[in-house]
Amino acid sequence: MKEYIASLEKEFSLIENGFKEEEKRALTDYKSNDNEYAKNLAFLAYKSVTYQVRMYGVFLFGYLSEQDDILVFMRDEVSKDDNWRVQEVLAKAFDEFCKKKGYEKALPIIDEWLKNNNPNTRRAVTEGLRIWTSRPYFKDNPNEAIERIANLKEDVSEYVRKSVGNVLRDISKKFPELIKIELGSWKLE
C-alpha cells in the first residue's frame, strides 16, 4: 500500500490544476477494493505531504462517508488542511455523503456542519451543495436550502460569507422571486 501511495505521489505531483485525475483514481480504487482496504488507503493517502494525494484521499473519504468515523474525520481533521484545493475536495466529498444518505435524511448533519466552529467545515456545506436547488429534495423545497444558507449571511468568516453570496446568486437563477424575498428581509447597514 505504501508503494502505491508513493507511485501516486510521483504521478499526481505533476498535476498542477484540477482534480479530475485524483477523483477518477479514487473512484476506481473505491470500486475495485473492499471498504476496509479503501479506508486504510484513504488514511494513508491523507498523511501524504503531496496535496494532490491528500485530495485523492479525501475523495475516498467521500465514498466511504457513510461510516461515522470517516464523516467525523472529514469534519474535524480534513477541514483543518491548509491547502485550499483539499478544502474544495472536502466540499465535493460532503456532497457525496449527502447524495449517498439522501439529501433530506442528511439535513441533521448538514445543520450540524453549518454550525461548526471551523469556517472550512461551514463552507464545505455551502460549496458542496452549491447547486442546492438542483439536488433531490432541495429542488422541490428550495426554501430549505435558502434558509440554511442565508443563516450564514453574517458569518464571522469572509470566506464563508463569499460562499453564501455565490450560492444565493446560483439559486437566484432558478428561483429569483424566492431570493428577492429573502434579500428583502435582510437588514443591511
Task: State each model region's role.
Residues 1-189:
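Alpha-helical scaffold domains
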